[in-house]
């Protein structure tokens, strides 16, 4: 019979899994890679076994719908050949009418950087993070423009 153990933080969980024979865990791809863990390929609705990487997760996210507020509705049944169907997104919540214009400008600057190629593509993709592009990127940038 197996046992359940825990560790603090994604780093701790990944390190513990790397030291524990036959262990199974969930961790972001960059933590798995850093700790030399194998990652699970998932069979998607198109019937392909796909690995969790930036390209495949981005292919999945590209099949989602984004509303005017940036909320995404995922299409878990997509037949996109390379789509990794367990992709997630992070949301940034920001005030559009902040009384503190200095803080609003700093938040806007951070959000702009996070969506920029120098962050998202050059750094984020190398760590396994998905990259927004095309219409999704344009929608996200238009939402960032409202921060203030």
Q: What positions do the PLM features span?
A:
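Periplasmic-binding protein-like
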Residues: 41-91
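Residue-level signal for the start and early helices of compact helical domains
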Residues: 4, 15, 30, 65-67, ...
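Short linear sequence motifs
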Residues: 19, 24, 67-69, 77, ...
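Ligand-binding pocket segment of bilobal, Venus flytrap-like solute-binding proteins
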Residues: 1-63
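Extracellular/periplasmic juxtamembrane helices and adjacent flexible linkers that interface
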Residues: 74-148
